[in-house]
UniProtKB/Swiss-Prot annotation:
Family the entry assigns: Belongs to the methyltransferase superfamily. PrmA family.
TM spans (from-to): none
Gene of this entry: prmA
The keyword Methyltransferase belongs to this UniProt entry's keyword annotation: yes
EC number, as in UniProt: 2.1.1.-
EC class of the enzyme, as a word: transferase
GO (cellular component) term, any one: cytoplasm
Full protein name: Ribosomal protein L11 methyltransferase
Record localization: Cytoplasm
Residues that coordinate or bind S-adenosyl-L-methionine: 133, 154, 175, 216
GO molecular function terms listed in the Swiss-Prot or TrEMBL record: protein-lysine N-methyltransferase activity
Length: 282
């Protein structure tokens, strides 16, 4: 074991966190931990170039989303004495129970009499601990039915798609990050389910209509995809929107007011909405 390793820490606004995680994974970084309201990246190799790249990436996101404030802060890089931080990382991840769905890692035991979802959090995009994921898991247990054609839009690690498949849905997944697709497919294999279709890209590449769509993505992207999402809803389809900070909830509701809002949930500052495709102009 090498005597030294490098640790990079930064804090990023919650709604952009997955973008930074995906960026780091794309660069081949695997040892990532979310802790202390921020993100730790550790490596035996120097992380100076990654630190610089993260700052450039943050600047580009600020320009893309027309923001007037920094979305990344407290960026620091230190050299530390080595320890088995992979084992430390494993100790810090706890399983999640949401009603009858039990989400756990590959090194944790299953729970009897529950729908067990096994996730390898090292692959990409988390292990289901986020508030918005919690809301989606709760809603999917209510609205997932056998034989429904379903889409996990922005699938990340594939948790939501796997849950829908466990309930008998014919699931398709998509994400703009190819690593997320690979992660979802591997996690599906771990859980003994298959996705009917998976592609790198967004809903504009989807074919046909869906009975159930779940989009656990940031509000800005939901607003951009609003028309495409609606155009792929079957009559009476269910649409679950999540990953929405409460300060954006009014904008989301205004954009989707032609659909019937049938349920909603807020955990801390994170909002989730469930719509039914009973359009008012029908």
């Amino acid at each position: 074991m090498q005597k030294k390793y490098y640790e990079l820490f930064f804090i990023v606004e919650e709604q952009y966190k997955n973008l930074f995680l995906g960026f780091a994974f794309d660069l081949g970084i695997e040892a990532i931990e979310e802790k202390d309201n921020g993100i730790y990246i550790r490596s035996h190799e120097s992380l100076e170039e990654l630190s610089w790249a993260l700052e450039i990436f943050a600047q580009k996101l600020t320009t893309t989303f027309n923001l007037n404030h920094k979305i990344i802060s407290n960026l620091s890089l230190v050299e530390k004495e080595n320890k088995d931080w992979i084992q430390e990382y494993k100790k810090g991840i706890k399983p999640i129970l949401v009603d009858n769905v039990y989400i756990h890692t590959t090194w944790q035991e299953e729970k009897k009499n529950c729908i067990n979802i096994k996730i390898n959090p090292a692959l990409a995009f988390g292990s289901g601990h986020h508030e918005s994921t919690h809301s989606c898991v709760k809603f999917l247990q209510k609205f997932s039915k056998s034989k429904l054609r379903a889409l996990d839009l922005g699938c990340g690690s594939g948790i939501l798609g796997i849950i829908m498949a466990k309930f008998g849905c014919n699931v398709e997944i998509c994400d703009t990050d190819e690593l997320a697709i690979d992660s979802s497919l591997e996690n599906a294999r771990l859980n003994g389910v298959d996705f009917h279709k998976a592609w790198c890209g967004s809903i504009d590449k989807a074919n046909g209509l869906y009975n159930l769509i779940v989009a656990n993505i940031i509000a800005d992207v939901i607003l951009i995809l609003e028309k495409d999402i609606k155009n792929h809803l079957e009559d009476n389809a269910i649409l679950i929107l999540s990953g929405i900070l409460d300060k954006y909830s009014t904008r989301i509701k205004e954009k989707f007011q032609d659909l019937e809002l049938i349920d909603e949930m807020q955990i801390n500052e994170w909002c989730s909405f469930v719509y039914k495709n009973n359009k008012k102009d029908k």
